[in-house]
Design a protein with these regions (language model features):
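Amphipathic alpha-helical repeat scaffolds of TPR domains
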Residues: 224, 232-251, 274-296, 322-336, ...
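Hydrophobic/aromatic-rich core segments of domains that either
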Residues: 146-217, 281
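Short coil turns that delineate tetratricopeptide repeat
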Residues: 270-271, 317, 324, 358, ...
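Secondary-structure boundary elements
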Residues: 63-135, 185
Length: 510
């Protein structure tokens, strides 16, 4: 409701106390809406929402656990209308695959029958992007992940040992059966199950599918998509649903949904030591890092993003990937502060976030802090006042950091060069030389000041020599001697002036 309308409706009958309360309320509301609300860093669901025994840390989940995890990874709450409907459907699937008709089948035939059942009653249309299990069940539209996880849950309910397989581009299942053809004792027979099409049990074999006319479309996976396969835990396999959704949300710039979902996916495999679990952690780090690298042009607003990022690090722990992005985030924040000449924010941010950055980035940050401080503090001041302010700053205990001192020397050098260049422009070479001597007391290693000092020196000597020559050529030897003596008081060791004096002595000796 607009504020004016709100006040007009109630102010005529309010006492002062009520007006104060409403004013405070409106102020709080305005303040809240002016703040950026960042994504939650907490998982959108937890293992105890799925596991019958939350202490179980093994790879294998039960059929119900796989299915419940698949629904939650699909962003389908178990108590939602869709969730309850899917749970009822799965109870129906479990009842059929565990019926006497199914259980009397040989294990291999039972695995094939589970896939046929899913295509007979539920899966109808392949869609590369449709990764949600609830949507697959309720609409028949599926992809490799949603159909693969659904098959895993149903096959487990049928008493089969089934494991998930993932590649860079694909996901499918493998059924493990006792080996009845001889060979090593306890060796299992592996049969891949390509769940993207009804002929996918033991790919390469051909068979008749009941109700084939109801299947609108299915997918034949290119052979190259099977390269570099990894066998993964049930948790990882069901979590592929969440991983796909997070990728989609990245494209939509929707980190409010992506980060809590990615956190839930990782929380489920937190204790697992595997390449796939490491990939889940890396994916979560990418989500947070992408968010903190959002293109924000306001330093104060962006500082909130960096603070959020440190909260994420506190919650999930530092990794090499997060460290790199933390260093970058603070660097970007300080650059924004430099552009906006906001030294107080830069200094406060550096002090707050310093525990999260590397020593190398801390040194770089100190240089940027110096740039911000001097760019904002020296602007518009005469060079002499700049030098005074810089020297005062350099003497303060809190500014003894090597990187800060290094940048301060740069600004001090520039201030002195302003003075010296002015002397050069007005051809006041002697004053310029004297000023350069003073400057070198502060900046003894400055090649720029040494270079301009030499120019002053050479010009001074040239002027003295030319004045001497003019007087000597006119036979005004006393004036010529005065010129040399005055010059040698300033430059007593100059060879040119000494040679001129020797020449004058010879000229006047006769």
């Amino acid at each position: 409701m607009p504020k004016k309308l709100f006040y007009r409706c109630i102010s005529y009958r309010m006492n002062k106390k009520n007006i104060l309360v409403i004013s405070i309320f409106l102020f709080i509301c305005a303040f809240c809406f002016s703040q950026k609300i960042h994504p939650s860093i907490e998982p959108v669901f937890l293992p105890e929402d799925v596991l019958v025994n939350a202490n179980r840390a093994g790879w294998s989940l039960s059929a119900d656990e796989v299915f419940r995890l698949a629904l939650l990874c699909s962003e389908c709450p178990l108590d939602s209308e869709a969730g309850e409907k899917c749970l009822l459907i799965f109870e129906k699937i479990k009842a059929e695959v565990s019926s006497d008709d199914f259980m009397q089948l040989e294990l291999e035939e039972r695995g094939r029958a589970v896939l046929k059942l899913l295509y007979r009653d539920y899966l109808t249309t392949y869609d590369f992007h449709q990764t949600r299990t609830d949507v697959a069940l309720l609409t028949g539209v599926y992809n490799c992940v949603s159909s693969g996880v659904l098959y895993m849950a149903a096959a487990k309910a049928a008493g089969l040992e089934v494991r998930g397989q993932k590649t860079t581009e694909h996901a499918f299942c493998t059924v493990y059966l006792p080996n009845t053809s001889g060979g090593k004792t306890n060796q299992l027979k592996k049969i891949d199950v390509e769940t993207t099409n009804p002929y996918g049990f033991n790919p390469g074999t051909r068979e008749t599918i009941e109700n084939e006319d109801k299947i609108q479309s299915y997918y034949v996976v290119p052979k190259k998509y099977y390269a570099n396969r990894q066998e993964v835990s049930d948790r990882i396999f069901a979590g592929l649903i969440a991983g796909n959704l997070c990728s989609y949300y990245i494209e939509q710039n929707n980190y409010e949904k992506a980060i809590p979902l990615g956190a839930a996916r990782y929380e489920f495999v937190l204790q697992e030591k595997s390449k796939a679990a490491n990939e889940a952690r890396r994916d979560l780090d990418v989500l947070a890092s992408n968010y903190v690298n959002t293109d924000i042009q306001d330093a104060k607003l962006f500082s909130g993003y960096v603070e959020w990022f440190t909260g994420f690090i506190d919650r999930w722990g530092m990794t090499d990937y997060l460290q790199k992005n933390m260093d970058t985030a603070l660097y970007n924040l300080l650059v924004l502060c430099l552009q906006q000449k906001d030294f107080p924010l830069a200094e406060a941010s550096f002090n707050k976030f310093k525990p999260y950055i590397t020593q190398k980035q801390a040194a770089t940050s100190q240089e940027i802090l110096a740039d911000i401080f001097f760019d904002s503090g020296l602007e518009g001041l005469p060079a002499e006042e700049q030098i005074e302010l810089i020297n005062q700053t350099l003497s303060q205990p809190q500014n003894q950091d090597e990187a800060f001192q290094k940048r301060a020397q740069h600004y001090l050098e520039n201030a002195w060069l302003m003075i010296l260049n002015n002397c050069m422009n007005i051809r006041d070479y002697e004053t310029g030389f004297q000023k350069s001597e003073e400057a070198l007391q502060y900046l003894p290693k400055s090649s720029k000041i040494k270079k301009i000092q030499k120019a002053f020196y050479d010009n001074c000597i040239a002027i003295i020599h030319n004045n001497f020559a003019e007087q000597a050529n006119a036979q005004r030897f006393d004036q010529a001697r005065q010129v040399l003596e005055a010059g040698m008081q300033v430059f007593p060791d100059d060879k040119t002036l000494k040679n001129d004096l020797n020449l004058l002595n010879r000229m006047t000796a006769n």
